[in-house]
Protein backbone atom coordinates (compact mmCIF):
# COMPACT_ATOMS: atom_id res chain seq x y z
CA UNK A 1 0.00 0.00 0.00
CA UNK A 2 1.90 3.03 -1.27
CA UNK A 3 -0.34 5.37 0.71
CA UNK A 4 1.18 3.87 3.88
CA UNK A 5 4.04 6.19 4.77
CA UNK A 6 5.62 3.76 7.21
CA UNK A 7 5.63 1.02 4.55
CA UNK A 8 7.22 3.30 1.95
CA UNK A 9 9.86 4.49 4.38
CA UNK A 10 10.75 0.91 5.39
CA UNK A 11 10.51 -0.89 2.03
CA UNK A 12 14.00 -0.12 0.66
CA UNK A 13 15.70 -1.39 3.82
CA UNK A 14 13.46 -4.48 3.83
CA UNK A 15 14.54 -5.23 0.25
CA UNK A 16 18.22 -4.73 1.11
CA UNK A 17 17.91 -6.98 4.16
CA UNK A 18 16.23 -9.72 2.14
CA UNK A 19 18.26 -9.47 -1.10
CA UNK A 20 21.62 -8.32 0.26
CA UNK A 21 21.66 -5.06 -1.71
CA UNK A 22 19.38 -2.46 -3.23
CA UNK A 23 20.58 -1.92 -6.78
CA UNK A 24 17.52 -0.76 -8.72
CA UNK A 25 14.30 0.99 -7.70
CA UNK A 26 11.48 1.35 -10.22
CA UNK A 27 8.77 3.78 -9.10
CA UNK A 28 5.98 2.70 -11.44
CA UNK A 29 2.78 3.02 -9.45
CA UNK A 30 0.40 5.75 -10.52
CA UNK A 31 -3.21 6.76 -10.69
CA UNK A 32 -4.99 9.21 -12.92
CA UNK A 33 -7.63 11.72 -11.92
CA UNK A 34 -9.60 13.16 -14.81
CA UNK A 35 -11.73 16.25 -15.07
CA UNK A 36 -11.53 19.96 -14.35
CA UNK A 37 -10.00 20.99 -11.04
CA UNK A 38 -13.23 22.46 -9.58
CA UNK A 39 -14.80 18.99 -9.87
CA UNK A 40 -11.97 17.21 -8.04
CA UNK A 41 -12.77 15.89 -4.59
CA UNK A 42 -10.41 16.19 -1.64
CA UNK A 43 -10.13 12.38 -1.78
CA UNK A 44 -9.01 12.52 -5.44
CA UNK A 45 -6.39 15.15 -4.65
CA UNK A 46 -5.08 13.37 -1.55
CA UNK A 47 -4.86 9.97 -3.25
CA UNK A 48 -3.18 11.35 -6.38
CA UNK A 49 -0.61 13.23 -4.31
CA UNK A 50 0.04 10.19 -2.10
CA UNK A 51 0.55 7.68 -4.93
CA UNK A 52 2.05 9.84 -7.67
CA UNK A 53 4.29 12.12 -5.59
CA UNK A 54 4.68 11.19 -1.94
CA UNK A 55 5.28 7.44 -2.40
CA UNK A 56 8.10 7.83 -4.96
CA UNK A 57 9.55 10.72 -2.93
CA UNK A 58 9.63 8.58 0.22
CA UNK A 59 10.99 5.54 -1.62
CA UNK A 60 13.76 7.67 -3.15
CA UNK A 61 14.54 9.29 0.20
CA UNK A 62 14.89 5.89 1.87
CA UNK A 63 16.77 4.29 -1.06
CA UNK A 64 19.43 6.93 -1.69
CA UNK A 65 21.38 6.47 1.57
CA UNK A 66 21.37 2.70 1.07
CA UNK A 67 22.58 3.04 -2.52
CA UNK A 68 25.19 5.62 -1.56
CA UNK A 69 26.49 3.29 1.15
CA UNK A 70 26.97 0.46 -1.33
CA UNK A 71 28.64 2.57 -4.02
CA UNK A 72 25.67 3.48 -6.20
CA UNK A 73 22.39 2.39 -7.67
CA UNK A 74 19.69 3.17 -10.17
CA UNK A 75 16.27 4.75 -9.74
CA UNK A 76 13.79 4.89 -12.60
CA UNK A 77 10.60 6.88 -12.09
CA UNK A 78 7.53 6.62 -14.30
CA UNK A 79 6.36 10.14 -15.05
CA UNK A 80 4.33 11.01 -18.16
CA UNK A 81 4.52 13.05 -21.35
CA UNK A 82 1.68 14.95 -19.70
CA UNK A 83 4.06 15.90 -16.92
CA UNK A 84 6.24 17.64 -19.51
CA UNK A 85 3.50 19.22 -21.66
CA UNK A 86 0.10 19.41 -19.98
CA UNK A 87 -2.97 18.02 -21.67
CA UNK A 88 -6.53 19.22 -21.10
CA UNK A 89 -8.76 18.40 -18.15
CA UNK A 90 -6.25 16.40 -16.11
CA UNK A 91 -4.75 19.10 -13.85
CA UNK A 92 -4.15 16.89 -10.82
CA UNK A 93 -2.53 14.10 -12.85
CA UNK A 94 -0.46 16.57 -14.87
CA UNK A 95 0.72 18.37 -11.73
CA UNK A 96 1.75 15.16 -9.97
CA UNK A 97 3.61 13.81 -13.00
CA UNK A 98 5.34 17.19 -13.50
CA UNK A 99 6.43 17.07 -9.87
CA UNK A 100 7.85 13.57 -10.38
CA UNK A 101 9.70 14.70 -13.51
CA UNK A 102 11.18 17.63 -11.58
CA UNK A 103 12.12 15.38 -8.66
CA UNK A 104 13.88 13.06 -11.11
CA UNK A 105 15.98 15.90 -12.50
CA UNK A 106 16.81 17.23 -9.03
CA UNK A 107 17.83 13.83 -7.67
CA UNK A 108 19.77 13.01 -10.82
CA UNK A 109 21.83 16.14 -10.40
CA UNK A 110 22.16 15.92 -6.63
CA UNK A 111 23.22 12.26 -6.40
CA UNK A 112 25.22 11.62 -9.57
CA UNK A 113 28.43 12.11 -7.56
CA UNK A 114 27.36 9.12 -5.45
CA UNK A 115 27.04 6.96 -8.57
CA UNK A 116 23.26 6.99 -8.22
CA UNK A 117 21.56 7.44 -11.57
CA UNK A 118 18.01 8.76 -11.43
CA UNK A 119 16.01 8.94 -14.67
CA UNK A 120 12.37 8.84 -15.70
CA UNK A 121 10.39 7.29 -18.48
CA UNK A 122 7.60 9.59 -19.71
CA UNK A 123 5.01 7.62 -21.67
CA UNK A 124 2.06 8.96 -23.57
CA UNK A 125 -1.03 6.73 -23.73
CA UNK A 126 -0.37 3.06 -22.92
CA UNK A 127 -2.88 0.26 -23.46
CA UNK A 128 -3.40 -0.68 -19.82
CA UNK A 129 -6.30 -1.61 -17.59
CA UNK A 130 -6.12 1.91 -16.14
CA UNK A 131 -6.61 3.47 -19.58
CA UNK A 132 -9.45 1.11 -20.49
CA UNK A 133 -11.26 1.59 -17.17
CA UNK A 134 -10.99 5.35 -17.63
CA UNK A 135 -12.79 5.07 -20.95
CA UNK A 136 -15.46 2.85 -19.40
CA UNK A 137 -15.95 5.28 -16.51
CA UNK A 138 -16.68 8.00 -19.05
CA UNK A 139 -19.20 5.80 -20.89
CA UNK A 140 -16.93 5.13 -23.86
CA UNK A 141 -16.28 1.83 -25.60
CA UNK A 142 -12.62 1.11 -24.74
CA UNK A 143 -11.91 -0.69 -28.02
CA UNK A 144 -13.26 2.18 -30.12
CA UNK A 145 -11.51 4.77 -27.95
CA UNK A 146 -8.19 2.94 -28.32
CA UNK A 147 -8.72 2.67 -32.08
CA UNK A 148 -9.26 6.43 -32.17
CA UNK A 149 -6.08 6.99 -30.15
CA UNK A 150 -4.16 4.62 -32.41
CA UNK A 151 -5.12 6.76 -35.39
CA UNK A 152 -3.69 9.84 -33.67
CA UNK A 153 -0.21 8.37 -33.21
CA UNK A 154 2.31 8.73 -36.05
CA UNK A 155 3.59 5.17 -35.46
CA UNK A 156 -0.01 3.96 -35.84
CA UNK A 157 -0.73 2.71 -32.32
CA UNK A 158 -0.51 3.67 -28.68
CA UNK A 159 2.14 1.99 -26.59
CA UNK A 160 1.71 -1.42 -25.11
CA UNK A 161 3.24 -2.07 -21.68
CA UNK A 162 6.25 -3.84 -23.21
CA UNK A 163 7.20 -0.65 -25.07
CA UNK A 164 7.57 1.09 -21.72
CA UNK A 165 9.20 -1.88 -20.00
CA UNK A 166 11.90 -1.96 -22.68
CA UNK A 167 12.81 1.68 -21.99
CA UNK A 168 12.82 1.11 -18.23
CA UNK A 169 15.08 -1.92 -18.74
CA UNK A 170 17.43 0.23 -20.80
CA UNK A 171 17.49 3.00 -18.17
CA UNK A 172 18.24 0.41 -15.48
CA UNK A 173 21.08 -1.10 -17.52
CA UNK A 174 24.72 -0.19 -18.00
CA UNK A 175 23.83 0.89 -21.54
CA UNK A 176 22.39 4.05 -19.92
CA UNK A 177 25.49 4.57 -17.76
CA UNK A 178 25.88 8.22 -18.81
CA UNK A 179 22.24 9.17 -18.35
CA UNK A 180 21.31 10.92 -15.15
CA UNK A 181 18.36 13.23 -14.55
CA UNK A 182 17.01 12.39 -18.00
CA UNK A 183 13.33 12.41 -18.93
CA UNK A 184 12.79 9.91 -21.74
CA UNK A 185 9.58 10.36 -23.72
CA UNK A 186 7.99 7.24 -25.17
CA UNK A 187 5.21 8.61 -27.35
CA UNK A 188 5.18 6.97 -30.78
CA UNK A 189 5.87 10.39 -32.26
CA UNK A 190 2.75 11.91 -30.72
CA UNK A 191 3.45 14.87 -28.46
CA UNK A 192 0.80 15.95 -26.00
CA UNK A 193 -1.32 18.60 -27.68
Language-model segments: residues:
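Short C-terminal tail/terminal secondary-structure segment
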Residues: 85, 169, 180-193
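Active-site loop-to-helix junction immediately N-terminal to the catalytic Tyr of the SDR YXXXK motif
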Residues: 40, 86-94, 106, 134
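Substrate-binding pocket helix/loop in short-chain dehydrogenase/reductase
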Residues: 36-37, 44-46, 149
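Active-site helix of classical SDR
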Residues: 60, 96
Amino acid sequence: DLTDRIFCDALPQMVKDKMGSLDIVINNAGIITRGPLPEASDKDITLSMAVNIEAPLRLCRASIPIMAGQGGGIIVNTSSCWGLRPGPNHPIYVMTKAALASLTQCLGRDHAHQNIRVNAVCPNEVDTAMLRSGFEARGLDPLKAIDDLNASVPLGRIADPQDITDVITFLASDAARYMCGSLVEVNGGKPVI
